[in-house]
Regions:
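Short, charged/polar surface micro-motifs in flexible loops or helix N-caps
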Residues: 50-52, 62-66, 86, 131-134
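Short beta-strand His + acidic residue motifs that chelate non-heme Fe in jelly-roll/DSBH
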Residues: 69, 89-90, 106, 112-119, ...
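Glycine- and acidic-residue-biased ligand/ion/polar-headgroup-sensing regions
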Residues: 75-77, 81-87, 92
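Short acidic-glycine-tyrosine-enriched beta hairpin
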Residues: 93-109
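Double-stranded beta-helix
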Residues: 113-158
Length: 158
């Protein structure tokens, strides 16, 4: 199944999609346009959710397998958030362990790859890709409170 078979629901200020369980991401295959690359267990969210500020993907790598190539970026750094499994991550000539709870940031120039070192469990992660050096604010500076009592009653349900 390709990720084009996924659908999102939208409202005035949001989009939502259900990808299913991380352990079932292997049913999706990403095929890179203009390149002979097929990646099983990878779903990009930019088109699905109409993202405007980042590319995000969710990923699943079967036991005892490796991503079959190294890659870099021209402009974007990547943040990897590991949510299940155990593996190893390689940046340039440095290899380090990753597991649930590990977070990795890689500069655009970093040559990267990873592998699943488990005999039984999938390695699952989320990747956030955004322009390096573009975020100068502190996390809370852009947000502001809304003077409204929280209520879950009488709301539209999707």
């Amino acid at each position: 199944m390709t990720q084009s078979s996924l659908a999102s629901k939208t409202g005035q200020n949001f989009a939502v999609a259900d990808l299913g369980l991380f352990s079932e991401l292997h049913q999706f295959t990403f095929e890179a346009p203009e390149k002979p690359i097929k990646l099983e267990g990878k779903v990009f969210l930019k088109q699905l959710l109409s993202l405007t500020s980042a590319e995000i993907s969710v990923n699943n790598l079967p036991p005892r397998t490796s991503v079959p190539f190294y890659h870099k970026h021209r402009l974007n750094e990547e943040i990897y958030i590991f949510v299940r499994g155990t593996g190893e991550f390689q940046v340039d000539d440095c290899v380090f362990p990753v597991h649930e709870g590990t977070v990795v940031r890689v500069d655009p120039e970093g040559e990267r790859c990873m592998r699943n070192t488990s005999d039984a469990e999938e390695l699952c992660w989320i990747v956030i890709q955004s322009r390096a050096g573009s975020y100068a604010d502190h996390t809370i500076q852009d947000g502001f409170g809304v003077q409204k009592r929280v209520s879950w009653v009488g709301k539209e349900r999707l």
